[in-house]
Amino acid sequence: MPEAIEVRKVPLHSVSDASELAKLIDDGVLEADRVIAVIGKTEGNGGVNDYTRIIADRAFREVLSAKGNRSPEEVAEVPIVWSGGTDGVISPHATIFATVPADKVTKTDEPRLTVGVAMSEQLLPEDIGRTAMITKVAAAVKDAMADAGITDPADVHYVQTKTPLLTIHTIRDAKSRGKTVWTEQTHESMDLSNGGTALGIAVALGEIDMPTDEDVMHSRELFSSVASCSSGVELDRAQIVVVGNARGVGGRYRIGHSVMKDPLDQDGIWAAIRDAGLELPERPHSNDLDGQLVNVFLKCEASQDGTVRGRRNAMLDDSDVHWHRQIKSCVGGVTAAVTGDPAVFVSVSAAHQGPEGGGPVAAIVDLGQ
């Protein structure tokens, strides 16, 4: 049986700041050696050369090492997933997941939050965006489900991943071995890596059948409703965090999910919060959350047809500001308006993650019992 989970959201006061994690440990809210995952937003450009993710990663791992007893190698294995880019009102923050000692667990037989982690086999540059990647990711997702004690895919509400994208160095490496890569555009490879990973999640959870190489980035009707995929230069494997609910684990927290049909779909966010177990009025307001919402996690994407609700926009044609940053800022504002809190996890590049032009939403709530 997996252990119950404590989950807290903390602000980042600067890109290298992990003081709020240290404070949680010092105050006895959680133990350094029991931290099993961190998911957060940093204030970089969100692109290939966004090194704020590496800086924040180092800061958090240094606190875990200094405050706990795990070896550097053990701390290095803790999944810490940073999504770069806090465009608009989105505020840099981290959501920290830690297991709870049995003697401190709130007992209940109701479904409660459970977390499982896994790492895939090495993803070679020639794998990215192809069925080799999908197969390796799917296997790792199943490992993470087992780690979370989840047997029914319906109990999985959020799968956060971090995978490698392509760089000039890895493209050259593939070519030196006589291999080809899906694209030589490094920024485009971010969307590609995320999309291929999402299809792997969808396969693992039975949402779709195994796709072909040709389906990747093209057959947008193939998607996962719970995938949240990020990519970067920090690793060469798929780092998987599966978050769901299980009976018997105990604890105060529960997760739910839904999808946004488009960037303005506030109802999709509220549906995820309801699915997590909060009772809300027919037309809810942020005041109705009453401090029980821990965080929401969203992916977003500019619709390939260049419209929202029949109105055209210029995001995909804008040469000054990439559409990644524009849609993230838009959805970040919509989400913050719902939650009343700009510290929300909104990540861009949602190919095969939720419906075309929309994206998946997960919500974690504190039920207090």
Curated annotation (Swiss-Prot):
Superkingdom, taxonomy of origin: Bacteria
Chain residues that bind Mg(2+): 301, 350, 353-355, 358
Site location (Important for substrate specificity): 324
Entries under InterPro entries matching the protein: AtzD/Barbiturase, AtzD/Barbiturase_RUA, AtzD/Barbiturase_RUB, AtzD/Barbiturase_RUC
Gene Ontology terms: biological process: uracil catabolic process
Summary of activators and inhibitors of this protein: Inhibited by cyanuric acid.
Keyword Cell membrane: no
The entry's keywords: Hydrolase, Magnesium, Metal-binding
Catalytic activity, as annotated: barbiturate + H2O = 3-oxo-3-ureidopropanoate
Chain spans, region RU A: 2-104
Region of interest: RU B: 112-247
Pathway(s) the chain acts in: Pyrimidine metabolism; uracil degradation via oxidative pathway; malonate and urea from uracil: step 2/3
Residues that bind substrate: 53, 83-84, 194, 230-231, 328, 347-348
Active site annotation, chain numbering: 162, 230
EC number: 3.5.2.1
Quaternary structure (record): Homotetramer.
UniProt similarity note: Belongs to the cyclic amide hydrolase (CyAH) family.
Function field: Responsible for the hydrolysis of barbituric acid (2,4,6-trihydroxy-1,3-pyrimidine), an intermediate in the oxidative catabolism of pyrimidines. Catalyzes the hydrolytic opening of the pyrimidine ring of barbituric acid to yield ureidomalonic acid.
HAMAP family attached to this UniProt entry: Cyc_amidohydrol (MF_01989)
Record protein name field: Barbiturase
Annotated gene: bar
